[in-house]
Amino acid sequence: MTLDNYNIFGDEYLFSMPLSPLPKVLGTFDGIQSAPTLTTPTLTPTTLRSIEETFFEMTNDAPYQAGFKPPPLAPLVNNNNNNNNNGNGNGNGNGNQQQQQVFDCGASVMPGSDTEESNGSWADGQMNEDQSISDTSSGATDSTSYQNGHMMGNSGGGNGGGTGGANNFSNVLAAAGRNTNTSNSATPARRGGGRRPNRSANMTPEEEEKRRIRRERNKQAAARCRKRRVDQTNELTEEVELLEKRGENLKKEMELLNETKNQLEYFLQAHRPTCQKVRADMLSVTTCNGLIGPPALLSAGSCGSGSSHHNNNSNSNDSSSGTITGLDATLNSTGRSNSPLDLKPVPIDEDLLLHIKDEPLDGALDSSSSLDQDGPPPHKRFALPNIATLMTPTGPAGSLQTPVSGTAPHGFGSFPTTISNISSIHNGPTLNSLNKMPKERPNTLAFQRPFGGQMQLSVSGRAPTQIQGVPIQTPSTGTFNFDSLMDGGTGLTPVSGPLIPNCTSQNKHPLELPTPTTEPSKLVSL
């Protein structure tokens, strides 16, 4: 026999009873693993098994307890008649209708094909599998009382004044309370929920001890978990507080630094007007084609200087024209100019020249000294005459140290060796030439003005060919002379005179002596 054979949840029973009170009735059964509640009115396999066990227990009761069989018809009719006598006329019809439905339900619950022998055989098999009579006796009593109360109380449904299914459920609960038998089990009825009953009757003491130990261990593990969670929460809270304090300290430090910066800026602005400005002309150097010199001298040589820049921090360098500013302007001009550094003579007062004392050449001055390395290379240097005798008249009578003039090139033999109006020369000696003056000097100075507008020509109108007895060996000397073109070669060969020693060259510093390697070859320009 299965639950389907009973068919207690048939269409007639479900339509005759309201659906909402059903979970309340099933919730009172003992032994249900997952008892349905008001929010979950569904039937689970565990609930169905519990219901089957309950029905099995009810089949073992005595026949006088009615079980699944309806009571005799006559007493029920008499009871109904008695109730009709006490009730009103409107309740009679409703009472008869409910009685008919109850009898139909009883017929559907107890079909004629099932017999007590089949119920007994099914009960024997269930007895061997599970011994749960004592555990579920209270539930069985409740179920039996529910069946009896339902069948016995529906006959008096007319007392409710025609309220129908709701009054029937109230009568069922009232009948269940009146007909409840005493429970045969010592285990109290469960209040619902939970995985297992509080104590099983068939559990041995060893199993109970193991269960107790397991529960204690689980409690300790849960307590440790809670403690660990609390400790971790406290640590995170402390860390957050520490970070907040650190952020506040950083904000205060930033505010202090900003205040200090504002004060320093205010002091700087207040002190700036009192600072003395550096003179602009102290750091400015005028250049012309890579040469450094005073502005007056460079302007005489028709080389305009650019506008001066007053930038004390940056060093501007212009090799062609302009102004170099900065402390290292001379070094920048020397290293970055297009042409090598060349120091030119500057105008010197004539009265100052008269007070300069002639000193003999220092023979210990070697080529490695700093004075020897300054200035132009040897082939660009020239010796200056005796400063004390610059203004003396030229001629054999006024000369005390007449040099032995070297033989000029045969192409320049007709040129005079002096330049008139020597007093008009404004170019004086340089520092290097003053330091390297020979001991014996001539009393004449014949050379062209480097920055003069016109060449100083002699009376005959020809260019000079010698300076202090040293022949001029540059191509520009014979550029505009026909004899030099005819006698000096084809214009593609170097034009130079023979190297004839004289007094001037013998008394020169060894580094200033002309040698074939000191002067580069010069070509005549046509």
From Swiss-Prot:
Question: Tell me, what is one Gene Ontology molecular-function annotation carried by this entry?
Answer: RNA polymerase II cis-regulatory region sequence-specific DNA binding
Q: Which domain of life is it from?
A: Eukaryota
Q: Where is this region: Disordered?
A: 71-165, 178-221, 301-345, 504-526
Annotated protein name in UniProt: Transcription factor kayak
InterPro entries per the record? Answer: AP-1 (IPR000837), bZIP (IPR004827), bZIP_sf (IPR046347)
Q: Which UniProt keywords apply?
A: Activator, DNA-binding, Nucleus, Phosphoprotein, Transcription, Transcription regulation
Quote the subunit structure annotation: Homodimer. Heterodimer with Jra. The kay-Jra heterodimer binds more stably to the AP-1 site than either of the two proteins alone.
Record's GO cellular component terms: nucleus
- GO terms classed as biological process: embryo development ending in birth or egg hatching
Q: What Pfam family is a match, any one?
A: bZIP_1
Q: Where is the composition biased (Polar residues)?
A: 178-187, 330-340
Query: Is the keyword Chaperone assigned to this protein?
Result: no
Show the segment(s) annotated as Leucine-zipper.
236-264
Ranges where the bZIP domain occurs: 208-271
Bias class Low complexity marks the residues at 78-87, 133-153, 301-322
Question: Gene3D superfamilies from the entry?
Answer: 1.20.5.170
Q: Where primarily located?
A: nucleus
Q: What does this protein do?
A: Developmentally regulated transcription factor AP-1 binds and recognizes the enhancer DNA sequence: 5'-TGA[CG]TCA-3'. May play a role in the function or determination of a particular subset of cells in the developing embryo. It is able to carry out its function either independently of or in conjunction with Jra.
Into which family does the record put it? Belongs to the bZIP family. Fos subfamily.
**Organism field:** Drosophila persimilis
